[in-house]
Amino acid sequence: MTRPMTQALTPADRALTWAQQAALVVGASMFVAVCARVTLPLPFTPVPLTMQNFGVLLVGLMLGRRRGFAALALYLAEGLTGMPVFSPTGPGGLAQLLGPTGGYLIAYPYVAALAGWIMERGPRTFFRAARAAVLAEILLFASGISWLVVFTHSFAQALRFGFYWFIFAEIIKVMLAAGITTGWRGVRKV
């Protein structure tokens, strides 16, 4: 016998109505779409530097695994239908999901879910949020680099195109997402 959906939710989730839950998911997918617009194309790699990863991390850390996954699955569905939610440097739609950055995009729901799952498992401290974001980034880059290997036929080339140039920026995104998450949770307690 399966449990009702309301029993599977955390106490904080049950406090929100279904309309509020849906609004959070839709709002989070829109937030990631806005983050995708903040893009810096790099001439030496097909992977642009964007704030998308930051948005994905923040959504996962703030909304938890279920809503984080739902928000990023919705984001991908929006992109597949042709809505301009992906980075403007790519072709958009299915072509963007099948292009060089597809491995990163496809991982987004799982990245948000992993970050959210870790945050749900203990005290909501900066260290936990940063650790959750780092582990989620490892999943993100493992997926993105694996996908790039298909295009470059070289693991070393995939690392050059999709990892090395982004390390410093990703550290900043992790710290920013962790800081906002724990700061916001502190403000909400007051």
Placement of each model-derived feature along the sequence:
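Alpha-helical membrane segments and adjacent membrane-interface helices in multi-pass membrane proteins
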Residues: 39-114
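Hydrophobic alpha-helical transmembrane segments
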Residues: 22-27, 54-58, 68-73, 101, ...
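Short helix-perturbing small/polar motifs within transmembrane alpha-helices
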Residues: 2-13, 20, 34, 92-142
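Membrane-embedded alpha-helical hairpins and interfacial helices in multi-pass inner-membrane proteins
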Residues: 45, 122-190
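Peri-membrane helix termini and adjoining interfacial loops of integral membrane proteins
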Residues: 1-5, 80-88, 152-157
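Alpha-helical membrane-inserting segments
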Residues: 31, 35, 39, 59, ...
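Short, flexible helix/strand-to-coil boundary loops that buttress conserved ligand/catalytic motifs
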Residues: 89, 118, 159
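Hydrophobic transmembrane alpha-helices
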Residues: 1-69
